[in-house]
C-alpha cells in the first residue's frame, strides 16, 4: 500500500518545482551524462542589480475534485500563472489520482511542468496478452513492455506529454542513478523483484512565439515483478511505473542559469498532511473492496467522505518520510547548483532557502518574502503586513 501511495504522491510532489527568469525582475514567497547534457556549473550568488526586488509567493493547490482541501503548496514568483491540478481517475483503484500542472512566466518563457504518472503492466503470459494486447488496460494499467528511463522518456513521455509541440529535438540524455537511489526506487521488498532507475533528457524546440527553447525532462522508472503459478507453469507479471515526471524550461542559453531559483522553489514544496492521510485511506478502502472500480465522481466523493481526519502515528511517520524524499529530490536534481542562501525565519521558527545575491530579505506573518539589494527599501512603507527583515544563517 505504501509503495503505491509513494509512487502516486511522488510524482505530484517531485513535481513541486519551478523555474524563473534569471533576471532579478519582480518576483515573494508568501501566503497564497551522456554527451549533450550540459553540467550545471557551481557558482556563487551574484550581486543583484541595484534596486532589484524579487517577490515570491506560496501557492496552495486545492484538490477541488477530491478532498476539497489543500493538496500541496510550493513557492512561485508572484506574477507567474499556475494552471492544472489533481485529477481523480475512475478506472484504477490502486492509482486513483494523478496530477498535471504548469507554472509559467507570462512576461517570458520560463516555466515548470509536472506530468501525470504512467501506470503500466507487462507479463510473459501469452494467453493473458491475447486478451489484453499492448495498448489495452489491465486493471487500470496500460499493457506495455518494460522500458528503461531514457527509453521511456523518448517512447512514452515525449510523444504523450509534448505532442502539441512540433520540431522537438533531443540533444542529450543522462542516467541519474543518484536520484533513483535518493528516491529509494527499486528498494527491496518481500516476495517481489524490484527495480528502479532515473534519467533526464534535454530537448530543444521553437515555441509558438518563435523563441528557441531548452527543456530538461526528468523521470523515474520503477516497478516490481512477481511469479505466479498457473496450469501452464510459472509466469511473471510486472507492475511498473514512469513517475516523478517533471520538466523545467527557459529560452536557449538561460536554462542552467535559472537553477538557483528552481532549487529554492523545489525545496519549498510541502504536501498537506491531511490530504496525504485522506489519499492513503482512499487507496486502502478501494483495495479492501477487492479493486472495485469507481463508476462516478459521486461515488468517489462518498469514499472520501468516509476518511478519518485523525492522522495516526504510522501515517505521520509515512508523511514525514515522504517529505524527506521530496527534499532529497531537490538535493539530487541540483546537487551541483550554488546560488541559493539559507535564512532563519523567526516568525515560523524555521530555515528557508532562497535565491542568493540579495543583501536584504524581508518576511511577514503570512509567509511572504521580499528579496532586494536596495538599502533604502522598506516594504512596511507601502504595506501593513508587518514585514520583518531576516538574516542569513
Residue ranges and their predicted role:
Residues 80, 244-288, 379, 386-389:
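Surface-exposed amphipathic alpha-helical segments
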Residues 86-240, 250, 299, 303-313, ...:
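Conserved polar/disulfide-associated segments of primarily extracytoplasmic proteins
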Residues 69-88, 265-273:
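Proline-anchored loop/turn motifs at beta-strand termini and strand-loop-strand connectors
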Residues 23-44:
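Short, low-complexity, disordered segments immediately C-terminal to signal peptides
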Residues 19-21:
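C-terminal motif of bacterial Sec signal peptides marking the signal peptidase cleavage site
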Residues 279-308:
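Charged, amphipathic alpha-helical linkers/stalks
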Residues 1-9:
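Bacterial N-terminal signal peptides that target proteins for export
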Residues 60-75, 252-263:
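Short aromatic-glycine motifs in intrinsically disordered, low-complexity regions
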Amino acid at each position: 500500500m505504501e509503495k503505491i501511495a509513494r509512487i502516486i504522491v511522488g510524482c505530484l510532489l517531485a513535481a513541486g518545482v519551478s523555474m524563473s527568469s534569471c533576471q532579478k525582475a519582480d518576483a515573494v514567497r508568501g501566503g497564497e551524462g551522456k554527451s549533450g547534457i550540459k553540467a550545471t556549473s557551481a557558482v556563487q550568488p551574484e550581486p543583484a542589480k541595484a534596486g532589484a526586488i524579487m517577490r515570491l509567493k506560496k501557492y496552495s493547490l486545492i484538490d477541488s475534485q477530491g478532498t476539497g482541501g489543500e493538496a500541496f503548496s510550493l513557492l512561485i514568483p508572484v506574477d507567474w500563472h499556475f494552471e492544472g491540478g489533481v485529477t481523480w481517475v475512475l478506472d484504477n483503484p490502486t492509482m486513483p489520482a494523478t496530477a498535471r500542472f504548469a507554472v509559467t512566466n507570462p512576461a517570458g518563457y520560463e516555466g515548470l511542468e509536472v506530468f501525470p504518472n504512467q501506470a503500466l503492466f507487462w507479463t510473459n503470459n501469452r494467453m493473458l496478452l491475447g486478451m489484453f494486447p499492448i495498448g489495452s488496460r489491465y486493471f487500470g494499467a496500460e499493457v506495455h513492455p518494460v522500458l528503461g528511463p531514457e527509453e521511456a522518456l523518448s517512447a512514452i513521455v515525449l510523444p504523450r506529454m509534448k505532442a502539441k509541440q512540433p520540431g522537438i529535438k533531443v540533444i542529450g540524455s543522462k542516467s541519474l542513478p543518484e536520484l533513483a537511489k535518493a528516491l529509494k526506487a527499486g528498494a527491496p521488498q518481500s516476495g517481489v523483484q524490484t527495480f528502479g532507475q532515473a534519467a533526464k533528457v534535454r530537448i530543444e524546440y521553437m515555441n509558438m512565439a518563435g523563441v528557441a527553447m531548452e527543456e530538461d525532462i526528468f523521470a523515474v522508472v520503477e516497478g516490481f515483478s512477481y511469479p505466479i503459478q498457473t496450469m501452464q507453469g510459472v509466469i511473471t507479471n510486472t507492475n511498473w511505473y514512469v513517475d516523478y515526471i517533471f520538466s523545467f524550461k527557459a529560452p536557449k542559453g538561460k536554462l542552467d542559469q535559472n537553477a538557483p531559483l528552481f532549487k529554492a522553489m523545489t525545496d519549498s514544496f510541502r504536501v498537506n498532511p491531511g490530504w496525504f492521510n485522506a489519499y492513503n485511506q482512499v487507496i486502502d478502502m478501494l483495495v479492501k473492496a477487492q479493486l472495485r472500480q469507481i463508476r462516478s465522481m459521486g461515488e468517489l466523493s462518498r469514499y472520501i467522505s468516509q476518511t478519518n481526519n485523525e492522522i495516526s502515528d504510522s501515517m505521520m511517520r509515512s508523511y514525514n518520510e515522504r517529505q524527506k524524499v521530496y527534499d532529497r529530490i531537490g538535493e539530487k536534481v541540483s546537487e551541483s547548483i550554488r546560488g541559493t542562501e539559507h535564512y532563519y525565519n523567526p516568525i515560523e521558527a524555521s530555515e528557508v532557502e532562497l535565491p542568493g545575491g540579495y543583501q536584504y530579505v524581508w518576511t511577514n506573518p503570512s509567509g511572504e518574502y521580499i528579496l532586494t539589494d536596495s538599502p533604502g527599501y522598506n516594504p512596511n512603507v507601502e504595506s501593513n503586513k508587518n514585514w520583518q527583515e531576516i538574516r542569513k544563517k
